[in-house]
Swiss-Prot record:
Sites where a glycan is attached: S81, N96
Gene name linked to the record: TNF
Assigned keywords, A-Z: Cell membrane, Cytokine, Disulfide bond, Glycoprotein, Lipoprotein, Membrane, Myristate, Phosphoprotein, Secreted, Signal-anchor, Transmembrane, Transmembrane helix
Source organism of this protein record: Ovis aries
Compartment(s) of residence: Cell membrane
Molecular function per GO: cytokine activity; tumor necrosis factor receptor binding
Official protein name in the record: Tumor necrosis factor
């Protein structure tokens, strides 16, 4: 029933009761009826406004956990992806500490992982299936003192797609740990410079991915898990 109909019914009832009212108590009855009518109309109007603007009423159904969600943290997205399927391609390789002076990836070390079709060939990860992938990598540089010439450290993740066979940089970063030269005779203080990169990309079966740096002689192998490279199918 609409608010207008409720008001019209109240006015009609008031008119009928006013005609029937008589005697010395007629005016008092009309006054009480008017007060009741006012309260009824006010309540009906308030109820209509609350329903119209959605303040009260049936609650909206919450979005199904299986539906799309674009503001979930990356960790939650990965956890949901892993729970939905355990046969998605994944790889996590670490730096080969037995190859000084160069960055070589290895999959036979502790905490390394190669599963569901991903291969490590020619120091590159080979994508086994089409789809969205999280690509990530971290390197850690270490040195003592700063040379007279500028020192720039680069970390680049590249893709060679099967469709055009051209090496393209998809993630790249550059840092300079030295802002001034270490004076002759001054103490050469140690410095550390980590670089982490990650992103989601649409890849094709057979794509090759590489993670490279420009100055491998500055790599820090002191602790395991400091230099790594990996992909996760989403």
């Amino acid at each position: 029933m609409s608010t207008k109909s409720m008001i019209r019914d109240v006015e009609l009832a008031e008119e009928v009761l006013s005609n029937k009212a008589g005697g010395p108590q007629g005016s008092r009855s009309c006054w009480c009826l008017s007060l009741f009518s006012f309260l009824l109309v006010a309540g009906a109007t308030t109820l209509f406004c609350l329903l119209h603007f959605g303040v009260i009423g049936p609650q909206r159904e919450e979005q199904s956990p299986a539906g799309p969600s674009f503001n979930r943290p990356l960790v939650q997205t990965l956890r949901s992806s892993s729970q939905a399927s355990n046969n998605k391609p994944v790889a996590h390789v670490v730096a080969n500490i037995s190859a000084p002076g160069q960055l070589r990836w290895g999959d036979s070390y502790a905490n390394a992982l190669m599963a569901n079709g991903v291969e490590l060939k020619d120091n590159q990860l080979v994508v086994p299936t089409d789809g969205l992938y999280l690509i990530y990598s971290q390197v850690l540089f270490r040195g003592h003192g700063c040379p007279s010439t500028p020192l720039f450290l680069t970390h680049t993740i590249s893709r060679i797609a099967v469709s055009y066979q051209t090496k393209v940089n998809i993630l790249s970063a550059i840092k300079s740990p030295c802002h001034r030269e270490t004076l002759e005779g001054a103490e050469a203080k140690p410095w550390y410079e980590p670089i982490y990169q990650g992103g989601v990309f649409q890849l094709e079966k057979g794509d090759r991915l590489s993670a490279e740096i420009n100055l491998p002689e500055y790599l820090d192998y002191a602790e395991s898990g400091q230099v790594y490279f990996g992909i996760i199918a989403l």
